[in-house]
């Protein structure tokens, strides 16, 4: 029996590799392995908790320089003294807010996830973008189409 979903996943993984977006490619390959093995029983958990686990891991990665001391507390305190750093803080707040809207949109309208993923892969492939955009892109989409 022909599995169209598997073909789509393989195509997206290939796009990931072609566009040098190894994060997307490896993620899709892991999902393909889960799909074609008995691990597929974990899909309900992955669908329910995957985004939360991913955000936790991302937050750990972002906070690691503070926790390790690589980014000293004095540098953090000085970020409130420079207008460029204050702009960076404001943009960080805005982008975090957008990401929150994006998470809500992706949960409420999962049919948009494929479009966001394809758009991210195309942005990396065609415009030398960086593959960090699906949550922020979803947040921007939510400003246009609403959260429902």
From Swiss-Prot:
InterPro entries: UPF0756_TM. Keywords: Cell membrane, Membrane, Transmembrane, Transmembrane helix. The keyword Transit peptide does not apply. It is a multi-pass membrane protein. It is found in: Cell membrane. The keyword Membrane applies. The chain crosses the membrane at residues 14-34, 51-71, 86-106, 121-141. GO terms for cellular component: plasma membrane. HAMAP family: UPF0756. Belongs to the UPF0756 family. This is UPF0756 membrane protein YeaL. It comes from Salmonella arizonae (strain ATCC BAA-731 / CDC346-86 / RSK2980).
């Amino acid at each position: 029996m022909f599995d169209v979903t598997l073909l789509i996943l393989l195509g997206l993984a290939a796009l990931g590799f072609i566009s040098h977006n190894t994060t997307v490619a490896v993620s899709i390959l892991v999902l393909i392995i889960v799909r074609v093995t008995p691990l597929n029983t974990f899909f309900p958990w992955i669908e329910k908790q995957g985004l939360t686990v991913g955000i936790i891991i991302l937050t750990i990665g972002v906070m690691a320089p503070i926790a390790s001391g690589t980014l000293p507390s004095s540098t953090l305190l000085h970020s409130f003294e420079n207008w460029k750093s204050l702009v960076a803080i404001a943009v960080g707040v805005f982008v975090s807010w957008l990401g929150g809207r994006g998470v809500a949109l992706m949960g409420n309208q999962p049919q948009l996830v494929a479009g966001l993923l394809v758009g991210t892969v195309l942005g990396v492939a065609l415009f030398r973008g960086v593959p960090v955009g699906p949550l922020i892109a979803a947040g921007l989409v939510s400003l246009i189409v609403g959260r429902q």
